[in-house]
Structure formats: C-alpha cells, structure tokens
Amino acid sequence: MKHPQFLPTWSWRLNWDTIRHDLTIGSCPRGPADLDRLQAEARISAVLSLQHDECLEKLEIDYPRLARYGRAQGLRMEHSPMRDFDPEDQRRRLPEAVRILHDLLSQGHRVYLHCTAGINRSSLVAVAYLTWIEGQSLDDAMALLQGARPEVSPYWDAYEGCGQDLIARHADQIRQRIAELSRQNPGRSAKIHRSRAEREMIRTALIG
C-alpha cells in the first residue's frame, strides 16, 4: 500500500471524529484552549499524544506546559512519541502506544488519540489496538475507522512489521501453542492453528 503524505497545502486546525463512545481521533491540541474545547465538546477524559519532539517544535507546542494544564483540568495526559513519516520508528514504538491505549480504555477513559493531523500515526495505533487486542478483523477495524474519519491512512509497513517482530520474538511459545491446539482440535488445519496461536501470542506479548 502507498504511504500517506500530507498535501502541500495542509495547515493545522483542531478537528476530530468520534470513532466510538470511548475513542476519538483527531489533530493535535496546541494550547490550553484546545484542551478545554475537546473536554467540553468531545467529552474526553484522557489524551494520548503520539507527536514526536520534531512535530512539537515545528508547531511551537510546549508539551510539558500543555500536559500540566490538562492534568490540572482532570485529564489523564499520556505521551508515546513516534516520528512522522518514519515507518521503521513507528514499527519499533507501536507496542508501547498500544499498551498505553489499552490501559486507558480498560480503565474506562474516553480517549482522545492524536498525532499531528490525526491521519497516520493515530490510525496506526488504533487499528493495531482493535485487531491485536480486541481481536477485530483488519477489514472490520478499518471500516470502523474510515467510517468515522475517512482520511485515516496508517503505514502498513509499520503495522505488519511490528506484528512480524512480535511473532519472531515468541516463536518457541507459538510452536508450543500450535502443538496444544493440534491435540485439542486435530480436525482443524495447521494454518488455522498457527493463525490463532500468533494472534494469542501478539496479544499476550502486548498486554500480558
């Protein structure tokens, strides 16, 4: 798949779309007034920023100050930076972001997940969470995301590469699980057992 790119005419504006009751994706808040608006209009209780320092500097965002303000307003403020337009960096950093998103959602937060434009990195983390943690199919997860925010466009190299890394790291446990599944369900194909074992191991590796 093609990598997403910003249009030359892209300029920042605060915008968001509600994916479901507990997850909203959008562009970055740049100051306290933006957090106030998100809290009042999107009714969020937590913010997960994926912006790298390079993004913050380019947009002149004082993230420590913004985070302090958000916490003072009762928001849970989390930061898991990923480099923009860098699928290799996103591949490495994706597990941490998925873990944080899971932690927030499992505690009942209404999460505002954002990168800079709310197109690439935020959708990458969302689709990884929906498929790897919640067990949705990739088609269903993307239909959910694009149904609410049509412009989302994750780096598939990062998504697939991270999944491959997790599988390779736990190859022995996956083989053991395949053997268990084969004994329990001898009538099913090895392909089905492998797919299930890999899905289970990715989820376990991410959240235990």
Task: For every predicted segment, state its role.
Residues C115:
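Short cysteine clusters
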